[in-house]
């Protein structure tokens, strides 16, 4: 029997981000590990979460609406990062896995701040905004396809083709 590990998953509020996170969570839980998921209210309303999945809503701040929107988003991201740091310290995950979308950003920033290993997973053929922003700041990048548009060449050594869960 392997030791129980803790995993923190973070995903945006759409099915494209949440369903792969749910799939990984289900597999990790089936293997006896403890898993927590961070998202926004929208994401946690998407059906399909494993019953044993611990969930947390953190502010993330979607960037839109001109300068005022940018400031509001930055403040929300900052607050979400602080809350995610507390969660990481309490939950003590072996790794933080981000699945893209704005709600994954605070947890990935918190992982970096706490020196917790982090991975992003890109489900699409185009690297999304949050994953593009975090690509140079994470330990590994899991991708679903051989060729990913907007993938930073400087991050090629972090890239691992795994497909979609």
Question: What is each model feature region?
Answer:
Residues 42-46, 95-114:
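An aromatic- and histidine-rich active-site surface loop
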Residues 34, 42, 112-165:
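Active-site-proximal region of nucleotide-activated glycan assembly enzymes
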Residues 9-17, 98:
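Short, glycine-rich nucleotide/cofactor-binding loops
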Residues 65-95, 105, 113:
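An amphipathic, basic-hydrophobic alpha-helix
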Residues 30, 85, 141:
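Catalytic machinery of carbohydrate-active enzymes
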Residues 5, 93-94, 139:
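Conserved acidic residues
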Residues 4-12, 29-79, 157, 162-165:
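Conserved nucleotide-sugar phosphate-binding/catalytic loop shared by glycosyltransferases and other
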Residues 17-29:
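Short amphipathic alpha-helix
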